[in-house]
Amino acid sequence: KLVLADYNRARAEEVQAKLKDKERFPVEWVDAGKQELIEALARKHGVGLIMNACDPVFNMPIFNAAYETGCHYMDMAMSLSEPHETDPYQKPGLKLGDLQFEQAEKWEKKGLLALVGLGVEPGMADVFARYAQDYLFDEIEEVGVRDGANLEVRGYEFAPNFSIWTTIEECLNPPVIWEHGKGWYTTAPFSEPEVFEFPEGIG
């Protein structure tokens, strides 16, 4: 059984109709910002895994609800970052995923698995980089990720590939950089521009 839970119940019902099996894919309304509602649904349906496909602003209530109800957990974007309070363009504050990673030991003690950041990057980019390290190259000096797309969704004039608010936040927050020998540091947004020509057909 897979519970389709959404704040907009009609959208969950659309998915259910496409799947043509109401018993196997029950629909529920949920406010992902309210941990107690998520816990109640998990207990009602005997959920074993919570797959979070919400905007990352809702990650922590969902993540914490999974822990409290003994569910394994997956998300696509990790807990949000926060700039350093006094020196945002030199020092990192709270990095993406810090709030989740700091709970790893207690999840492990409870026998629960949380796979976070399984979207494009981190996520797919990490898998590709590890594959390249293990099977394609003798030595890697740097891994760089560049985004480019010509995404089109029928019926929409503008279609971002993820939450538009998350994309804006990622562009405006100080970029967090890690360098061997230097560790983590930040710089001002757009302060170190790079011109990169994508292959034909992208961008």
Predicted feature descriptions by range:
Residues 7-11:
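Helix N-cap at the beta1-alpha1 junction of Rossmann-like dinucleotide-binding domains, i.e.
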Residues 15-25:
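Short, conserved SAM-binding/catalytic segment
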Residues 76-112:
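Rossmann-fold NAD(P)-binding glycine/threonine-rich loop
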Residues 2-3:
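Short beta-strand element of Class I
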Residues 107-203:
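Rossmann-like dinucleotide-binding core of oxidoreductases
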Residues 29-49, 54, 58-62:
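Conserved Rossmann-fold cofactor-binding substructure of NAD(P)-dependent oxidoreductases
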